Amino acid sequence: LVGITTLRQKWEAFVKDGRFSYLTVDYLSEKFPVEDCGENLFIASHVIATQHMAECAVALKPGKALLADTRGGERILLAVRGSMDDFMRFSEQHDGCELFEDKVDAITNVYDIFMLNGRQIEEDFEVLTKGREGQSIPRSNTVIGDPDLIYIESGAIVEGVVLNASH
């Protein structure tokens, strides 16, 4: 969990058909198995998805791959469209890969979760509330910070509480 949603939920929000498999380490492969089909979209499980990134990954043609540079300066295999053989080939050598133009956020160390959490909360808030209209904040509540940063789902009962949106 980085921000409000998990890394998987971030990808699912942008990959509309939800069909992708993770490029992950061996011990996580049981929890996140590869979809059993001929052609697959493999994505790097430690990368925080953005709309543009997901669009570029989904648009890959079969047998193609996408590399990216992380903000930490590491070049990674971001996505592969194709078979398990294609994935293995691109994992070993990056010849013929396209380069994603933006730097990406990736969780490579435990502390990355904490360093990226604030910005991810803000980005997730935008995605989750886009096009939705919540209810106004009842007067029995105390608001600290910007009330525009507080979303209350219609029908929720929120009375007599302190809502802190300062940080």
Residue ranges and their predicted role:
Residues Q135, N141-T142, I150, S154-V162, ...:
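A structural motif detector for beta-strand N-caps
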Residues L1-D148:
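Terminal amphipathic alpha-helical/low-complexity segments used for targeting or macromolecular assembly
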